[in-house]
């Protein structure tokens, strides 16, 4: 289906020269002089090569039909990351390069959105927030309640982030999956 280039967003899949590309970054640029353009950073699905393209904002681009389905993460092994469709219990193995930066945040039983084109997994979308345990951080210092400074911490999945001074090792915290930033102390 043809769409105007300016409507493309991160995660969309486009077809160019018979090959499929997933959009990693999309930006509409409106210079003071000249025609507006849409800058797309894409990854070719077949071999993972990154490509950068510029289109006029009114230019038509072929968008591939992609099915977004909810899947449950089961486990990972040498073949990749294994997910199950909760509707028909069908399992699918997703290669490591498709999962990418999402790998540390995957937890057994987690529901994720998987984009599939002709049975081939293209992209994975995590929930916005996940709850993880702080594995290691500096000790809590008394009297540091007034400052808004944060201290470095390592989470149970190996991701490094910054947390408020009152958070100690072993505390469960909620973090954003997009950038690993601290949101709040877990309520459970």
Swiss-Prot record:
Hey, which pathway is this one from? Answer: Protein biosynthesis; polypeptide chain elongation
Q: Which CDD domains match?
A: S1_EF-P_repeat_1, S1_EF-P_repeat_2
Q: Name one Pfam family in it.
A: Elong-fact-P_C
Instruction: Give GO BP annotations, semicolon-separated.
Output: peptide biosynthetic process
Mind telling me which HAMAP family this protein's record contains? Answer: EF_P
The Swiss-Prot or TrEMBL record describes its family as follows: Belongs to the elongation factor P family.
What is this protein's function per UniProt?
Answer: Involved in peptide bond synthesis. Stimulates efficient translation and peptide-bond synthesis on native or reconstituted 70S ribosomes in vitro. Probably functions indirectly by altering the affinity of the ribosome for aminoacyl-tRNA, thus increasing their reactivity as acceptors for peptidyl transferase.
What name does the UniProt record give this protein? Elongation factor P
Organism of origin: Methylobacterium radiotolerans (strain ATCC 27329 / DSM 1819 / JCM 2831 / NBRC 15690 / NCIMB 10815 / 0-1)
């Amino acid at each position: 289906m043809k769409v105007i280039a300016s409507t493309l967003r991160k995660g969309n899949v486009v077809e160019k020269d018979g090959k499929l590309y997933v959009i990693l970054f999309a930006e509409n640029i409106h210079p003071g002089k000249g025609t507006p353009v849409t800058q797309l950073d894409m990854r070719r699905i077949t071999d993972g090569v990154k490509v950068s393209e510029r289109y006029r904002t009114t230019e038509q681009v072929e968008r591939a039909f992609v099915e977004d389905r909810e899947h449950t993460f089961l486990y990972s092994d040498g073949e990749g990351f294994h997910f199950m469709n909760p509707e028909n219990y069908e399992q699918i193995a997703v290669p490591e390069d498709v999962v990418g930066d999402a790998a540390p945040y995957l937890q057994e039983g987690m529901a994720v959105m998987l984009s599939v084109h002709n049975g081939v997994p293209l992209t994975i979308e995590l929930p916005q927030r996940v709850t993880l345990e702080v594995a290691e951080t500096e000790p809590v210092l008394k009297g540091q309640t007034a400052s808004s400074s944060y201290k470095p911490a390592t989470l149970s999945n190996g991701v490094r982030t910054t947390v408020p001074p009152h958070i100690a090792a072993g505390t469960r915290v909620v973090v954003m999956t997009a950038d690993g930033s601290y949101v709040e102390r877990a309520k459970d």
